[in-house]
């Protein structure tokens, strides 16, 4: 979930007086996990400019010469091909200009240019020029449009353009607790956050327009599903236009695609209330409108131009011609709001979330609406939605154009009652009465929306997570901050002993951080799986599986004996939801009836250290880099490893897989997964390398390692670097490794870099090796000896047709 600080500022006006870290701390205190805080980095030399004149280019009818005022007495000419610039109404409006010397985020450096005989001293910026990462969210028609700003105050600093695009915003990327669907609503979230920040909140939005003049809702709606609510508002005789860039920017910041003025308003209302709204062109609706469950198979075309196969049981909204919306998922193309639309029906539904969840899962959809509708939505959230929508539409231009609600919604403010004992709450928290009085508890709960009558507590209707008095204790802890509670030691009749040799937890923590630094993402998956999956990727040939008696489902009936299958299912799920695939790893115990051992598994899917500006950059996944990764993991635990061939594997491609061996004992595998297996996970479109290691055998050996310490040599170590590539594609790095071991005078070597580069229009993989020469105190190295060793190494490389970078 993305939280915009500027959007939150509508409900908590003082939010900008708090630092981002303070807000993040309070969100964490609420039980919300803050994953990242994002701010926009603006390029230098961008500023607002006033359009003075627009003239056609004398030599190209697709270009226009714009005279711009960039300061009180400074003017420049800019040649532009923006689709929307040639309009007399743009005179005296403002644009954003990138002046000479600007380096845009897409890598473009702006220079003064002669464009067909006219000097251009900059470029008019489109939104993509300033924020290239939003390309997938912007309408295609706006990609080539210049940003036009209607009005800028006389005292505004023209160098400060970010606020007009809402790029001065801060975005908190968060995860809400699974039992707090209400926190998807910014209104409910702001209520709690305001209490923790000890500042005022304004949760009821009211229009400044006094004369409402609402008309009777004109459509005939039938709630055949008997849903909690089915209805909405009607807006008539409107003129369609785009939203201002301040609104578009807010939506883009939260990964919502701007559409037009009224649809954007509805989407912002959804952000505030967590109640999705479908917008329909009312003139395209035929006859009565029904909310119902589909009774037979049928198809309809959605807003995204895709055909959807509706099955019996799916919840749909229909008119007399057919389906106009798949509830909580997507509207139909037939009734979508278009530039010519003059009458809009804003449809709001509150119904069974479980059915919508199953439908969304079948269609592999995880869009803006379904994220909210797959969880229960309180009636209070629906009521907030209707009121926010009506007030947001209520402008002086729309007086007499907005209907009453189609039907009234009766909302009970409180859903249940609990009897609480304040003394028990203090005991559970571990705090004295003088530190937390009864009055303080009552005041705190009242601020959070609870109604307190002595020890009888009324629970707000949107708080479905509150069921026992212990849940109330959790609410109190949030307010007093759990970090401020004094720790109380655990009384025990025995002492915990800490190993003086090694701390396994620290070793694994260090290894986890190392993998995360390299760009791998830590995941946690289920221990239980089905019979078929349990036998897939049984790399260690384990037997005596643990089976569950009376399992919840057959999909969770057996304890897994490998982590690879679980990780591939993670990639499959993300791939189905069109999420970008990343490299992942997991630590987990593999349990059988005989044993329990700690394993580490890694899936390498994409290049490491890539750049969005240079896709060629990065380290590719191949068997050589997998060997390096395996060595790094084993070395992190204080061991070294060797590799042995793996023949006729059921899981890996031949010549692309190896056994990992430590002290002549096989501890794991690396390899390229066979495409036939990846077909089962819908992942056969790219190579996936995997690694699985039994860490238990190494960890149990750590305390019995004997170490020999050698004194430092008085002689300075001698090392040299060598960069090379293979001229023969069939060559292997192992050929170089075997050769360099045989060179007299070379004590050791290590691979320090692998990179790809273009050479003669061909992608070449290059390797850089650092080798160390023996420098014996009895026979120190001379320049002549070093040269002999180096020349011998070069000669051996030539024999193997290894091309050196000299």
From Swiss-Prot:
Quaternary organization: Tetramer of two alpha and two beta subunits.
Compartments where found: Cytoplasm
The UniProt record lists the keyword Hydrolase: no
Gene3D superfamilies: 3.30.56.10, Bira Bifunctional Protein, Domain 2, Nucleic acid-binding proteins, Phenylalanyl-trna Synthetase, Chain B, domain 3
Cofactor: Mg(2+)
Main location: cytoplasm
InterPro entries per record: aa-tRNA-synth_II/BPL/LPL, B3/B4_tRNA-bd, DNA-bd_dom_put_sf, NA-bd_OB-fold, Phe-tRNA-ligase_IIc_bsu, Phe-tRNA-ligase_IIc_bsu_bact, Phe-tRNA_synthase-like_B3/B4, PheRS_beta_core
Protein name: Phenylalanine--tRNA ligase beta subunit
GO annotations of cellular component type: phenylalanine-tRNA ligase complex
Record's catalysed reaction(s): tRNA(Phe) + L-phenylalanine + ATP = L-phenylalanyl-tRNA(Phe) + AMP + diphosphate + H(+)
Residues annotated as domain tRNA-binding: 40-153
GO biological process: phenylalanyl-tRNA aminoacylation
Binding positions (Mg(2+)): 465, 471, 474-475
Residue ranges of domain B5 in the record: 413-487
Record SUPFAM superfamilies: Class II aaRS and biotin synthetases (SSF55681), Nucleic acid-binding proteins (SSF50249), PheT/TilS domain (SSF56037), Putative DNA-binding domain (SSF46955)
GO function term, MF aspect, one: ATP binding
SMART domains attached to this UniProt entry: B3_4, B5
Note accompanying the cofactor annotation: Binds 2 magnesium ions per tetramer.
Family, similarity comment: Belongs to the phenylalanyl-tRNA synthetase beta subunit family. Type 1 subfamily.
Source domain of life: Bacteria
Entry-linked Pfam families: B3_4, B5, tRNA_bind, tRNA_synthFbeta
E.C. number: 6.1.1.20
UniProt keywords, alphabetically: Aminoacyl-tRNA synthetase, ATP-binding, Cytoplasm, Ligase, Magnesium, Metal-binding, Nucleotide-binding, Protein biosynthesis, RNA-binding, tRNA-binding
